[in-house]
């Protein structure tokens, strides 16, 4: 089978390509220029070229920087301006890696596209679904919730059945040159954020804009440095007059540049709503597991789909729900779909 492999210049994607080559597939390497400096791209392209030379496969470099800026980066900035906490990875995957890059791979005659994502593919009744990775500590299924089933059927995740701790020694044994590759230290959460998201925002919008902090009764009790510097659940960075106990951000009013704070129990919610992105129209209401944050544990809930809105009633309270984050619905370890929390 002819498969395109997205190569980042790192160990995971290189070892993914190695595994597929060992299985006898015909491969085409693809490096995506989405963001970052030309200096970084030059280094990572050089790394990807070394992997391709080792495997005896061609490498193509695709420049999608303009597309990435318009559909992912600018949306990230806008969401924070609106007082939300966006999830750019969940937007990038369907639009860039498994959108534009997949389209290009198909034009090259490839049947599928592979990446180093930690996730698996499951087929039920001839429909392809995203499934959690074997290594739950590295699972990335949450970020893949918005993919259409027709797209999922064209994906390959060679690392999905492996543990992260095992991959580096396996990769170095198979491809010794990987141990000599230079890399840059990247953000663990958002790939285009080098230091903090606030530093990224400062390049485009006024972040240092002092405002007031109110309690749940509407009384002004302190000040903050600018609403975009806070997310739901944050407990530091603002001044509360005479505070004797911790206060947490429970609401952000972007238009008024105000924060509303309360106690930890005030963060609790039993009900969530999200604008549907990928739950199928014939979705049956019932009890499922949900995630409302990447690092959160799956939580049992009653989930229903009404007029393009996903409604969730939680068995146990969820703390710190932020607008703009992804709400992902699971049946056991299978992703059924999800949406954006409103």
From Swiss-Prot:
Gene Ontology cellular component list: cytoplasm
Main location: cytoplasm
Ligand binding (ATP): 6-13, 32, 116
Disulfide bonds: 92-191
Recorded superkingdom: Bacteria
Keywords, in A-Z order: ATP-binding, Cytoplasm, Disulfide bond, Nucleotide-binding, RNA-binding, Transferase, tRNA processing, tRNA-binding
Active site: 92, 191
Region (Interaction with tRNA) location: 138-140, 293-294
Pfam family, one: tRNA_Me_trans_M
Record carries keyword Membrane: no
Reaction catalyzed: S-sulfanyl-L-cysteinyl-[protein] + uridine(34) in tRNA + AH2 + ATP = 2-thiouridine(34) in tRNA + L-cysteinyl-[protein] + A + AMP + diphosphate + H(+)
Molecular function GO terms recorded: ATP binding; tRNA binding; tRNA-uridine 2-sulfurtransferase activity
Subcellular location: Cytoplasm
BP GO terms, sorted: tRNA wobble position uridine thiolation
Record EC number: 2.8.1.13
Gene3D superfamilies in the record: Adenine nucleotide alpha hydrolases-like domains (2.30.30.280), HUPs (3.40.50.620), Translation factors (2.40.30.10)
Enzyme class, first EC level, given as a word: transferase
PANTHER family in alphabetical order: MITOCHONDRIAL TRNA-SPECIFIC 2-THIOURIDYLASE 1, TRNA 5-METHYLAMINOMETHYL-2-THIOURIDYLATE -METHYLTRANSFERASE
UniProt function note: Catalyzes the 2-thiolation of uridine at the wobble position (U34) of tRNA, leading to the formation of s(2)U34.
Family: Belongs to the MnmA/TRMU family.
Protein known as: tRNA-specific 2-thiouridylase MnmA
Gene name for this UniProt entry: mnmA
